[in-house]
């Protein structure tokens, strides 16, 4: 590589195979690569069952793995402690949202407020030209001079949904080295290089809820017995009682404790009245939704956008019309009714492979 193309790049290292391979590839391309892991949560109070290990990211074990990989490929490595900021910007929001009767997505908030804000700022302090991550997403610069965010080439691993908040300034300083690869290719590259994390499992759970028991976590944060109340139908008929609105999310069927001739699902959560609203499956259907905090990777042309949207990560994109409002909100109409529109989740707008933008679901239409 010619010297003029050599860049200083900070790579966010989680200790997993993806960011490890991304770091190795950037080093092999001749760049000056600096590995950084974020310490965001104290795992001292969590112990995995004997012989088992939590499938999460950002633990001390993961940081140790990242450090060893950095040593193996020959790059400097640092740990930045963002525990206080992560608590304030991600965890407190997660807890507050559940107690408002909403179902949050902390991974999007972490990307928005920590990784591509605080860590990107740290990269700039180190004089880096770019921050690279192991996300399966693509970034291209169009003929219009603007940066465009695209799905990762591997549809099974695409993580563009979690990145919809990225701005032009952030994209200009971000690299996704794995965007054109499949997971199988990444593991093969790791094995070929003898990286110790080549066969390491993938993180599955929320990093600060490693046992996936979010109810336990919320009750440790706020106490037990809070937000208890009635289970009602759409007409207000009382069908039972519940131990806390935060225990329920739209679409949930299990754990209602109600004997009823037809299957009932959670169709709404009214935290103010401490009510969990249930109904048959057809009451889960919505013709659209309202969204707040709507942001656009590339500014839309006009007040109406024809797109497809995902209302949760594993949701298949569906055709929709987005009515853009001046106050940063939007009204989204589906072409066909969709199930389980969940307040607090992210709605992300696509056109083919391109991420147009997204926002946070406020309510259903």
UniProtKB/Swiss-Prot annotation:
Residues where ATP binds: 12-19, 38, 134
InterPro entries: MnmA-like (IPR004506), MnmA-like_C (IPR046885), MnmA-like_central (IPR046884), MnmA-like_central_sf (IPR023382), Rossmann-like_a/b/a_fold (IPR014729)
Reaction(s) catalysed (UniProt annotation): S-sulfanyl-L-cysteinyl-[protein] + uridine(34) in tRNA + AH2 + ATP = 2-thiouridine(34) in tRNA + L-cysteinyl-[protein] + A + AMP + diphosphate + H(+)
Disulphide-bonded residues: 110-207
GO process annotations (BP): tRNA wobble position uridine thiolation
One Pfam match: tRNA_Me_trans
GO cellular component terms, semicolon-separated: cytoplasm
GO MF annotation terms: ATP binding; tRNA binding; tRNA-uridine 2-sulfurtransferase activity
EC number(s) from the headed UniProt entry: 2.8.1.13
Record-marked site positions (Interaction with tRNA): 135, 345
Subcellular location: Cytoplasm
Active-site annotation: 110, 207
Enzyme class: transferase
Assigned keywords, A-Z: ATP-binding, Cytoplasm, Disulfide bond, Nucleotide-binding, RNA-binding, Transferase, tRNA processing, tRNA-binding
Ranges where the record places region Interaction with tRNA: 157-159, 312-313
Role description: Catalyzes the 2-thiolation of uridine at the wobble position (U34) of tRNA, leading to the formation of s(2)U34.
Annotated PANTHER family: MITOCHONDRIAL TRNA-SPECIFIC 2-THIOURIDYLASE 1, TRNA 5-METHYLAMINOMETHYL-2-THIOURIDYLATE -METHYLTRANSFERASE
Family: Belongs to the MnmA/TRMU family.
Name this protein carries in UniProt: tRNA-specific 2-thiouridylase MnmA
Gene: mnmA
């Amino acid at each position: 590589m010619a010297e003029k193309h050599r860049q200083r790049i900070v790579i966010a290292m989680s200790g997993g195979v993806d960011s490890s391979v991304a770091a190795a590839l950037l080093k092999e391309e001749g760049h000056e690569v600096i590995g950084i892991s974020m310490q965001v949560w104290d795992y001292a109070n969590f112990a995995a069952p004997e012989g088992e290990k939590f499938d999460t990211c950002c633990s001390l074990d993961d940081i140790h793995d990242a450090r060893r990989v950095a040593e193996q490929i020959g790059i400097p490595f640092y740990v930045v402690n963002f525990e206080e900021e992560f608590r304030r910007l991600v965890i407190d929001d997660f807890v507050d949202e559940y107690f408002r009767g909403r179902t949050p997505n902390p991974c999007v908030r972490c990307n928005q407020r920590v990784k591509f804000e605080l860590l990107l700022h740290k990269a700039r302090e180190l004089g880096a030209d770019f921050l690279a991550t192991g996300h399966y997403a693509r970034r291209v610069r169009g003929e219009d001079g603007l940066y465009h965010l695209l799905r990762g080439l591997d549809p099974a691993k695409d993580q563009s949904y979690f990145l919809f908040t990225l701005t032009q300034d952030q994209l200009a300083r971000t690299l996704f080295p794995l965007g054109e690869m499949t997971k199988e290719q990444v593991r093969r590259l790791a094995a070929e290089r003898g990286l110790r994390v080549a066969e390491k499992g993938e993180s599955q759970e929320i990093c600060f809820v490693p046992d996936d028991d979010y109810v336990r976590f919320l009750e440790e944060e706020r106490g037990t017995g809070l937000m208890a109340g009635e289970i009602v139908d759409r007409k207000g008929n009382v069908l039972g009682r519940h131990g806390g609105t935060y225990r329920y999310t739209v679409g949930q069927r299990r754990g209602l404790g109600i004997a009823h001739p037809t299957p009932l699902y959670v169709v709404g959560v009214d935290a103010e009245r401490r009510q969990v609203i249930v109904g048959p499956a057809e009451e889960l259907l919505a013709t659209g939704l309202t969204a707040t905090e709507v942001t656009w990777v590339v500014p839309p042309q006009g007040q109406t956008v024809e797109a497809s949207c995902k209302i949760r990560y594993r949701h298949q994109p569906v055709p929709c019309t987005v009515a853009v409002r001046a106050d940063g909100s939007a009204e989204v109409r589906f072409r066909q009714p969709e199930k389980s529109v969940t307040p607090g989740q992210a709605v992300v707008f696509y056109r083919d492979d391109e991420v147009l933008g997204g926002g946070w679901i406020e309510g259903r239409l």
